[in-house]
Amino acid sequence: MIAGFFTRFLFAILLLLPYSQGFFNFQGNQRQQQQQHHQNANPAEGFLSPHEERALSNQCPGYLCPDTEECVDSPSSCPCPFPGSQLKCSLPDGTFVCISKPATDNEDINRKYDDLSGNSKIKFNGVRDCGWVYEMAVKGFST
């Protein structure tokens, strides 16, 4: 009885052996792909991503915003990547962060959030808007 079980077990292992080799050989395949990539790479083409190519070939005389590729005077002038759904919030150190606009049904509040000239100064109690972000930055995000 034990011999029959052992024989079936051995047969099952032998049957699954080719599949297990492919399953457990991830590292070898990864090294092989890396070697092929380096062998096929043309040094003249370089290793730049399309984003890097656009950034390096841009003729911006000022500052090129990394998220939007807009040409502006200074980093603080960069727009948010999605201005229709984001607020640009100023931080105490002069930098900024883009956050999602708070969801509200109040049209007056929505108009204030949509006003790009002043939306970074808005603070409504109980709402995580730019005022809340600024407050948390001053406190050190401890709460």
Curated annotation (Swiss-Prot):
Record's keyword annotation contains Ion transport: no
Cleavable signal peptide: 1-22
Key words of the record: Signal
GO biological process: ERAD pathway
Domain of life: Eukaryota
Keyword tRNA processing: no
Family per similarity comment: Belongs to the LCL2 family.
Function as written in the Swiss-Prot or TrEMBL entry: Probable component of the endoplasmic reticulum-associated degradation (ERAD) pathway.
Name of the protein in question: Long chronological lifespan protein 2
UniProt source species: Vanderwaltozyma polyspora (strain ATCC 22028 / DSM 70294 / BCRC 21397 / CBS 2163 / NBRC 10782 / NRRL Y-8283 / UCD 57-17) (Kluyveromyces polysporus)
Gene symbol of the encoding locus: LCL2
